[in-house]
């Protein structure tokens, strides 16, 4: 993740703060906690995968594998936590939207019982738009990787 560990201002981000920073909820919240947060630079998200995940009912019966697109979504949610915290975005009236994904690669399957470590770093940031590179690992094996972009959008107050 780079040599910026000494600049980290917060080691761990718990689920309560994640819920305050991004709008995703069960069954679509795919980040359990985060660590190694470096403002405007990088973050590591953690997802503990269990057999109780709703997608395992159909993907695939008898051979459960986490869908690759959901691994990319988990990377994007981790990036959204980094953006929200770095920009001090108040989630009231604002939403971070996924804009694009490039160079997605799926290397190894993620199965029930795995812990995904999602290493996300900022490649570029301009105003409210961030471009990221993310790598999802289980142990020392890369499960998926991609570059993706997101932006903060004014959505108005909640109804």
Curated annotation (Swiss-Prot):
Compartments (UniProt record): Cytoplasm
Active-site positions on this chain: 59
UniProt GO BP: fatty acid biosynthetic process; lipid A biosynthetic process
Keywords per UniProt: Cytoplasm, Lipid A biosynthesis, Lipid biosynthesis, Lipid metabolism, Lyase
Pfam name, any one: FabA
Catalytic activity: a (3R)-hydroxyacyl-[ACP] = a (2E)-enoyl-[ACP] + H2O
Annotated GO MF terms: (3R)-hydroxyacyl-[acyl-carrier-protein] dehydratase activity
EC number in record: 4.2.1.59
First-tier enzyme category under EC: lyase
GO cellular component: cytoplasm; membrane
Taxonomic superkingdom: Bacteria
Family matches, as NCBIfam families: fabZ, PRK00006.1
Role according to the record: Involved in unsaturated fatty acids biosynthesis. Catalyzes the dehydration of short chain beta-hydroxyacyl-ACPs and long chain saturated and unsaturated beta-hydroxyacyl-ACPs.
Family under the similarity heading: Belongs to the thioester dehydratase family. FabZ subfamily.
UniProt name for this protein: 3-hydroxyacyl-[acyl-carrier-protein] dehydratase FabZ
Organism of this sequence: Caulobacter vibrioides (strain NA1000 / CB15N)
